[in-house]
Amino acid sequence: MQNMVILGATGSIGASTLSVISANPDAYRVYALVANASVDKMLALCVTHRPQVAHMVDSQAALALQAKLPPELNIQVSSGEDELIALVTATEVDTVMAAIVGAAGLVPTLAAVKAGKRVLLANKEALVMSGELFIEATKASGATLLPVDSEHNAIFQCLPEEVQANLGRCDLAASGISHILLTGSGGPFLTAELASLAAMTPAQACKHPNWSMGPKISVDSATMMNKGLEFIEARWLFNTQNDQLKVVIHPQSVIHSMVQYRDGSVIAQMGNPDMRTPIAHCMSYPQRISSGVEPLDFFKVGQLSFCEPDFNRFPCLALAIAACAQGQEATTVLNAANEIAVEAFLQGQIGFTHIAKVNEACLSSVPKRAMTSIDDIIALDAQTRIYAREQLAKLA
């Protein structure tokens, strides 16, 4: 029986994780649920899953949850960063699902890694912001790191065992691998007229053709910044050079990514677009459990198509690839800028095409400096957010 902590329990990854746990009740137990401020959602999850601990990042939300929870459930409610770190590093905890969106997930995820936990990484920003520090912490603690993102999980499944066992420190060429092919659907605006993009609304951007996701990641998919962040994450997870990574647009989202070998072979991972599949894989690796996902019906799939990304349509993807080549400081800046820009777009403060403008301005203007600690990363992240908000004021 594995005791699990779910960071981001009220989000879409949290819901999918709890679904897989419910399908395999003899193997997994919800030890703790962690959320930001969604009291009613957390209350419902507590009643259903009976965790020992419910942690709310927002202290007022924690008080509200405490007042609403039936006493007979005997669930401890906590709040505060120190309490969260104590929770993910507790000796009772076996596995941590790291699914808090954005930079907010970095500190607890890194704490779980340093404690040597089995970490299921759905928070791509952790590696985007702190790649080298994160990988070194994994190596030092002996933590098990498993990628939940559908693309990285697909790549992981297509890799030989010696690479799987050495994430972040592997040598792809020595294992006969020539390229990693990172697939992406192209999002809801793949075929829209370029001139129409400036007028696209948050509702349109969040209407993904294949996946069910939260608002931030949906917008990132529409700009293909999501694929850019995944490009950076793949660089750290699989220890790649930029020329070993390629982005391929695949609108049907049936092939979730591929690995190309030196002998000409290409191994692909396929399946219906449902996050329960990679979550179940990570939870049970190296075994297999039921995810509750319908098997892929090849007779219903029809045709599969592929094309190169158009960087005029997806400037955020180009910025991410460029930042990856520049190094850790640039990717930290880009991630922070993008979080501010996407939030502003979702709130109707800026237009869709302004997201790339804010990102580009920050990437070219925020001073970069060497980062040797988590404090350095957080400081650069904060500095970038201030500059990004200044750019928003100019666009308003």
Curated annotation (Swiss-Prot):
First-level EC class: oxidoreductase
This protein's encoding gene: dxr
Catalytic activity annotation: 2-C-methyl-D-erythritol 4-phosphate + NADP(+) = 1-deoxy-D-xylulose 5-phosphate + NADPH + H(+)
Highest taxon of source: Bacteria
Keyword Oxidoreductase in annotation: yes
Binding site for Mn(2+): D149, E151, E230
Pathway noted in the entry: Isoprenoid biosynthesis; isopentenyl diphosphate biosynthesis via DXP pathway; isopentenyl diphosphate from 1-deoxy-D-xylulose 5-phosphate: step 1/6
GO molecular function list: 1-deoxy-D-xylulose-5-phosphate reductoisomerase activity; manganese ion binding; NADPH binding
Keywords: Isoprene biosynthesis, Manganese, Metal-binding, NADP, Oxidoreductase
Cofactor needs: Mg(2+); Mn(2+)
The protein's name: 1-deoxy-D-xylulose 5-phosphate reductoisomerase
UniProt record similarity statement: Belongs to the DXR family.
